Curated annotation (Swiss-Prot):
The keyword Magnesium applies. The gene is lysS. GO terms for biological process: lysyl-tRNA aminoacylation. It catalyses: tRNA(Lys) + L-lysine + ATP = L-lysyl-tRNA(Lys) + AMP + diphosphate. Belongs to the class-II aminoacyl-tRNA synthetase family. It is found in: Cytoplasm. The keyword Magnesium applies. Its EC number is 6.1.1.6. Binds 3 Mg(2+) ions per subunit. It comes from Neisseria meningitidis serogroup C / serotype 2a (strain ATCC 700532 / DSM 15464 / FAM18). This is Lysine--tRNA ligase. Mg(2+) 2 binds at E421. Its cofactor is Mg(2+). InterPro entries: Aa-tRNA-synt_II (IPR004364), aa-tRNA-synth_II (IPR006195), aa-tRNA-synth_II/BPL/LPL (IPR045864), Lys-tRNA-ligase_II (IPR002313), Lys-tRNA-ligase_II_N (IPR044136), Lys-tRNA-synth_II_C (IPR018149), NA-bd_OB-fold (IPR012340), NA-bd_OB_tRNA (IPR004365).
């Protein structure tokens, strides 16, 4: 605030003493009036007032006496003799309030002087500019709308404890403008993706979150129990098989933005509950899906950042240029030019090299699986600018259509940006007999100890037997997309309430 050197601070008490003092204040308020009134009607947001009147000079603005009603949380406060200043914060930003005994009664001033930082207030008055040019509301009436019983983090230190930041997101959102902006951007990104899909004539749908058979991805599911039916159910690991059932049913372009759940480890890139978009288009293929993914990401960046050339962790990322396309072997060789074709097709050599790069050997010992594991160890993390890795082995792509021209490979891609996977898609396998055989192979892998291998889904095979048209499909991780476009370094910074160990 321009008129103040230091905001009001709490007395030098510990948190429990401060809470007790504030509870006593609340008790006194209850004796006099409704402590939590709900009849104040705000008519203005801080950001709108700054946008409309912020550039108008004091001489022009003050005589107009423009009336406003604002409300928000009190973040700064200072008494100056018979006058007081305060700054309140709403969802859009902050605005300053000015009170003196000419504008409000002494009783109102006395009440105001007993209020604390963090209290939620509603103020009515007229706009003016201070001598320092700050847009301010000259208050004619102000009311306490909600008493804050707990003190806010120190304004200058902020909420620096990461554990508290994630457990008490409500405090983080109050104290940290950066966090508020991240989650506002998250909403805008999701809306941008949704608008883009609708513009491409896709139909938004909702499919089950609890599945009788887990499927659509290779991952460990969460298991629950339906009491009335007395059956196990699985929180979905992916919506894929239900969405493709809809394509069988004639809904030729469908998408879903929703949660999926995977009972696996947590990291800076992984949360067991996460948001993704999956979309499917009949009479399409993985080439079209790659272009869709590219356009979705580029459009979202332009929407929230005004550009498709962004910075992540201090390094430029080019989302504007056409995304590069490499096969798994091409990517390995790009960053390890000393590897030979002979070595990359030698199972024993691959196993040794995989271990050397700190990766685990895949459950399936095929050449394709080994090449993929080596790629993950020696090339994936180096793919900074967006790169499609294409033509994955059949053995690691149980739902993708086999290539007509490249034996043992599928029409599948994964998109990598800043060294991490962002999207996965393919030309869908639409041969029911081939799909049944691949499901059986997955069951064999599961029996051999691969917990993440897929189950056999007989109803999905039945749906395919009615005829699934040639179809392209793609999934994009929304949380990782938000991380990329907001320059966030951990997934916990873009999920409002990330999974945490119990306190």
């Amino acid at each position: 605030m321009s008129e103040q050197n230091h905001p009001q601070t709490e007395p030098q008490l510990d948190e429990n003493q401060i809470i007790a003092l504030r509870r006593e204040k609340l008790h006194n308020i209850r004796q006099q009036r409704n402590a939590y009134p709900n009849d104040f009607k705000r008519d203005s947001f801080a950001a709108d007032l700054h946008a409309q009147y912020g550039e108008i000079g004091k001489e022009e603005l003050d005589p107009q006496g423009i009336p406003v009603k604002v409300a928000g949380r009190m973040m700064l406060k200072r008494q100056m003799g018979k006058a007081s200043f305060a700054t309140i914060q709403d969802v859009s930003g902050q605005i300053q309030l000015y009170l003196n005994n000419k504008g409000v009664s002494q009783e109102v001033l006395d009440d105001f002087n007993h209020w604390d930082l963090g209290d939620i207030v509603g103020a009515e008055g007229t706009l003016f500019k201070t001598n320092h040019g700050e847009l301010t509301v000259r208050v004619s009436d102000i009311r306490l709308l909600s008493k804050s019983l707990r003190p806010l983090p120190d304004k200058h230190k902020g909420l620096s404890d990461q554990e508290t930041k994630y457990r008490q997101r409500y405090v983080d959102l109050i104290a940290n403008e950066e966090s508020r902006n991240t989650f506002i951007k998250r909403s805008q990104i999701i809306q941008s993706v949704r608008n883009f899909m609708v513009g491409e004539h896709y139909l938004e749908v909702e499919t089950p979150m609890m599945h009788p058979i887990p499927g659509g991805a290779t991952a460990k599911p969460f298991v629950t129990h339906h009491n009335a039916l007395d059956i196990p159910l699985y929180l979905r690991i992916a919506p894929e098989l239900y969405l493709k059932r809809l394509v069988v049913g004639g809904l030729e372009r469908v998408f879903e933005i929703n949660r999926s759940f995977r009972n696996e480890g947590m990291s800076v890139r992984h949360n067991p509950e996460f948001t993704m978009i999956e979309f499917y288009e009949a009479f399409s293929d993985y080439e079209r899906m790659m272009q869709m993914a590219e356009d979705i990401i580029r459009n979202a960046s332009r929407t929230v950042n005004g550009t498709a050339n962004i910075t992540y962790n201090g390094k430029e990322v080019d989302l504007e240029s056409p995304f590069e396309r490499l096969t798994i072997l091409e990517a390995i060789k790009k960053y390890n030019p000393h590897y030979t074709d002979e070595q990359l097709n030698d199972a024993e050599w691959l196993k040794k090299e995989i271990v050397k790069h700190g990766e685990s050997l895949p459950p399936s010992p095929g050449i394709g699986s080994l090449q993929l594991a080596l790629f993950e160890g020696c090339a994936e993390g180096k793919l900074w600018n967006p790169t499609f890795i294409i033509d994955y082995p059949v053995e690691v792509s149980p739902l993708a259509r086999a290539s007509d021209t490249k034996q043992g490979l599928t029409e599948r891609f994964e998109l990598f940006v800043v060294g991490r996977e962002l999207a996965n898609g393919y030309s869908e396998l639409n041969d029911p007999e081939d799909q049944a055989e691949r499901f059986k192979a997955q069951v064999a892998q599961k029996d051999a100890g691969d917990d993440e291998a897929m189950h056999y889904d007989a109803d999905y095979i039945r749906a395919m037997e009615f005829g699934l048209p040639p179809t392209g499909g793609c999934g994009i991780g929304i949380d990782r997309l938000v991380m990329l476009l907001t320059d966030s370094q951990t997934i916990r910074d873009v999920i409002l309430f990330p999974q945490m160990r119990p306190e």
